[in-house]
Regions:
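Sec-dependent N-terminal signal peptides
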Residues: 6-8
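Positively charged n-region of N-terminal signal peptides that target proteins for export
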Residues: 1-4
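A structural boundary/capping signal
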Residues: 19-243
Length: 243
């Protein structure tokens, strides 16, 4: 079984002890080392909001964007995102078929941890990317999607599980790590390809979180589909996000 190997660079920041995580696909963006701000990953995890967000009913990408926004707003931490893409072998979850899952990730002393607070019954603390992949895909035989692998990136627009076997080999799942501002798989694809799902050129960069997107994500994360139709959550999200 192949282990999760994250393609990152560790760069020394202004502090002699800071180890910022720089992602290969996003070389101009750094994931903050929380230790330089006096934070511990366990404390940050315990403070993640699970009261406003409907943890059991919300979509992972919506709550992940809100939590990434919270890290930036409350602790001035630039968190990343870890996107997992399933194959037919790994995407069956009970009666459902998942094609992707996403969690915020943070950097502590140069090591990355998944902060998936959406499953309070089974995840009670930060876990390593390997542990997270094993938990949600049942495997760590996962391929990292690189910026030049356009055929794999284009699949992010489709909404279907990935093939196990491609020209890159045979894998149980795929993953990519992004800045925290990338909301959905489609947004990741737009950013890397420079085109939308119709092939039209776009300039889409989310090194910072977009306020309109996090507001929309919040409304969807705190209400049911019926509640959204009735306008539920809008006031709560504006107040909570400070927008």
């Amino acid at each position: 079984m192949k282990s999760f190997v994250m393609t990152i660079a560790l760069g020394m920041a202004s502090s002699a002890f800071a180890q910022d995580v720089v992602l290969t696909n996003y070389p101009n963006w750094k994931m903050t080392d929380i230790s330089t701000k006096g934070y511990k990953k366990e404390i940050l995890f315990s403070k993640m909001n699970r009261d406003l967000i409907k943890v059991g009913a919300s979509i992972c990408s919506n709550r992940a964007l809100v939590w990434a926004y919270d890290f930036k707003r409350n602790q001035n931490i630039d968190a990343g995102k870890l996107f997992l893409f399933y194959t037919k072998k790994t995407g069956e979850v009970g009666l459902k078929t998942w094609w992707y899952h996403v969690t915020p990730v943070i950097n502590e002393n140069g090591s990355v941890y998944a902060m998936d607070a959406g499953f309070p019954g089974s995840i009670v603390k930060p876990i390593t990317p390997n542990e997270w992949l094993k938990k949600f895909a049942g495997s760590t035989n996962c391929k990292e999607i690189k910026a030049n692998e356009t055929d794999l990136i284009e699949r992010m627009f489709d909404g279907y599980v990935y093939p196990s076997t491609t020209s890159y080999g045979t894998y149980d799942c795929y993953y990519t790590i992004t800045p925290g501002g990338y909301w959905t798989p489609g947004s990741v694809a737009k950013g890397l390809l420079g085109v939308d799902e119709d092939g039209k050129p776009v300039h889409y960069v989310r090194d910072e979180i977009d306020n309109e997107e996090v507001y929309e994500a919040c409304v969807e994360a705190v209400t049911s589909s019926v509640g959204r139709v009735l306008g539920g959550g809008k006031k709560r999200c504006k107040e909570y996000l400070g927008l």
